[in-house]
């Protein structure tokens, strides 16, 4: 039998694992149960009514959370000429081509997101085995391969999150930090749900948004009443 930690025991009585909570109440409980000494991330798991084994039902995309994520993203951009200058002006932390590729091959990757202009993919394509496993490979489906590198950089800096359904049909994402006001977390979750709804595969049948649960980095998952999410 699994032993409960002291912290988990303290949550007992506060959270009913079988109950569907209105979103505001669920987030309030998550914040209350987030007792770590650091500003815990507030995360969401959304169960979708899709068959993740089918290639035409893979849900993937990106959305700019209206209230940000609470984390400053470091952005690297593969671009040259005018596009490189646009990326720098938009706030990119690192801009380059072969020199940036050499950094990455040497294991020097001081960034969280990689963006590439289309003509830079000849260089980026050689880095697939390094960037791919880390979830950093640029992809047009999430807006990280684009001729408009400036907008992509601004979106990344403004709190854009990428999402992709896993093998179990669940999308995991952060929606902010414990220090965020509940209404800001609600706004971010509503934006994510709206993006997921718009990304619904045409071949998906039946109920699409099946379950939603919110949690903190070190806390318990709390199920949310879908009717309380205003997207």
UniProtKB/Swiss-Prot annotation:
Entry-linked CDD domains = Ribosomal_L1
Which organism does this record belong to? Answer: Albidiferax ferrireducens (strain ATCC BAA-621 / DSM 15236 / T118)
Keywords noted in UniProt = Repressor, Ribonucleoprotein, Ribosomal protein, RNA-binding, rRNA-binding, Translation regulation, tRNA-binding
List GO molecular-function terms, semicolon-separated: rRNA binding; structural constituent of ribosome; tRNA binding
Its family remark reads: Belongs to the universal ribosomal protein uL1 family.
Under the subunit heading, UniProt states:
Part of the 50S ribosomal subunit.
User: What does the entry give for GO biological process?
Assistant: regulation of translation; translation
Q: Where on the tree of life does the source sit, at the highest rank?
A: Bacteria
Briefly state the protein's biological role: Binds directly to 23S rRNA. The L1 stalk is quite mobile in the ribosome, and is involved in E site tRNA release.
Which Gene Ontology CC terms are recorded? cytosolic large ribosomal subunit
Q: Gene name, please?
A: rplA
Q: Which InterPro entries does this one have?
A: Ribosom_uL1_bac-type, Ribosomal_uL1, Ribosomal_uL1-like, Ribosomal_uL1/biogenesis, Ribosomal_uL1_3-a/b-sand, Ribosomal_uL1_CS
The molecule here is called Large ribosomal subunit protein uL1
């Amino acid at each position: 039998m699994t032993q409960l930690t002291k912290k988990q025991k303290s949550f007992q009585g506060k959270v009913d694992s079988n109950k569907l909570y209105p979103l505001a109440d669920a987030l309030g409980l998550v914040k209350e149960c987030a007792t770590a000494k650091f500003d815990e991330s507030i995360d969401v798991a959304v169960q979708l009514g899709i068959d993740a084994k089918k290639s035409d039902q893979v849900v993937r995309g990106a959305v700019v959370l209206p209230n940000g994520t609470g984390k400053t993203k470091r952005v690297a951009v593969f671009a040259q000429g005018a596009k490189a200058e646009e990326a720098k002006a938009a706030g990119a932390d690192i801009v380059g081509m072969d020199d940036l590729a050499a950094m990455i091959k040497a294991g020097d990757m001081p960034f969280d997101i990689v963006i590439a202009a289309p003509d830079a993919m000849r260089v980026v394509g050689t880095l697939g085995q390094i960037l791919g496993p880390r979830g950093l490979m640029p992809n047009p489906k999430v807006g990280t391969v684009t001729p408009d590198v400036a907008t992509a950089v601004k979106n990344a800096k403004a709190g854009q999150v990428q999402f992709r359904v896993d093998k179990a049909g669940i999308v995991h994402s952060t929606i902010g930090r414990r220090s965020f006001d509940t209404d800001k977390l609600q706004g971010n979750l509503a934006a994510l749900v709206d993006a997921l709804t718009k990304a619904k595969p045409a071949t998906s049948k039946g109920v699409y948004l099946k379950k939603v649960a919110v949690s903190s980095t070190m806390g318990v998952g709390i199920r949310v009443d879908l009717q309380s999410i205003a997207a």
